[in-house]
């Protein structure tokens, strides 16, 4: 049995430290902790690392599609690794929660997150797990403001707290991973 953990984010150096890429950042931390190294898998539209956690095979995946097209990569990996819906976890930013908030649950909606919407649409189900990481909401109104906000870098204050925040997210999912 294999578990699939998908971080939502955008490919490219310019997005590495943005709020929208917090899913990638958590996977980088998880891979480092369990000695995994990411490698490209163009057929899966992603880079991935295979790790073993408590004798369980876990695939960590960072799609190379953009956030709004995440579902294509999740479906390709689901088929390739023969993963059940219950063994899929998607890690995403959440602008509806303050920075530092962590929520882990199954069978839930998108909360307006386009990557989650696309994943649910492509999988034709929301029966997968989500780890939502609060990144806060912009202080300026409008959809354009939201897009600019999630594509902007963390504030200095947030950067100082980021490692602890990522660790909090990892601790939340370790029981699901078998630890």
UniProtKB/Swiss-Prot annotation:
Enzyme class: hydrolase
Name of protein: Peptidyl-tRNA hydrolase
GO cellular component: cytoplasm
Residue(s) at site: Discriminates between blocked and unblocked aminoacyl-tRNA: 10
Self-association and partners: Monomer.
Function noted in UniProt: Hydrolyzes ribosome-free peptidyl-tRNAs (with 1 or more amino acids incorporated), which drop off the ribosome during protein synthesis, or as a result of ribosome stalling.
Residues at the active site: 20
Domain of life assignment: Bacteria
Membership in a protein family: Belongs to the PTH family.
Species annotation: Chlamydia trachomatis serovar D (strain ATCC VR-885 / DSM 19411 / UW-3/Cx)
Keywords: Cytoplasm, Hydrolase, RNA-binding, tRNA-binding
Reactions catalysed according to its record: an N-acyl-L-alpha-aminoacyl-tRNA + H2O = an N-acyl-L-amino acid + a tRNA + H(+)
Residue numbers binding tRNA: 15, 66, 68, 114
Annotated GO biological process: protein quality control for misfolded or incompletely synthesized proteins; rescue of stalled ribosome
Annotated site residues (Stabilizes the basic form of H active site to accept a proton) in this chain: 93
InterPro entries: Pept_tRNA_hydro, Pept_tRNA_hydro_CS, Pept_tRNA_hydro_sf
């Amino acid at each position: 049995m294999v578990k699939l953990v998908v971080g939502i984010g955008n490919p490219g150096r310019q997005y590495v430290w943005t709020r929208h890429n917090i899913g990638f950042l958590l996977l980088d931390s998880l891979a480092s902790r369990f000695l995994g190294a990411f490698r490209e898998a163009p057929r899966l539209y992603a880079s991935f690392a295979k790790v073993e956690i408590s004798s369980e095979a876990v695939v960590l995946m960072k799609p190379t599609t953009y956030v709004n097209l995440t579902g294509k990569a999740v479906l390709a990996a689901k088929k390739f690794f023969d993963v059940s819906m219950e063994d899929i976890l998607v890690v995403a930013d959440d602008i509806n929660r303050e920075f530092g908030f962590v929520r882990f649950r199954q069978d839930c909606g998108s909360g307006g997150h386009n990557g989650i919407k696309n994943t649910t649409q492509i999988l034709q189900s929301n029966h997968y797990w989500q780890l939502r990481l609060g990144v806060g909401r912009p202080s300026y109104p409008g959809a354009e403001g939201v897009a600019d906000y999630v594509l902007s870098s963390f504030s200095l204050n947030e950067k100082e707290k980021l490692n602890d925040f990522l660790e909090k997210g990892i601790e939340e999912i370790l029981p699901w991973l078998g630890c």
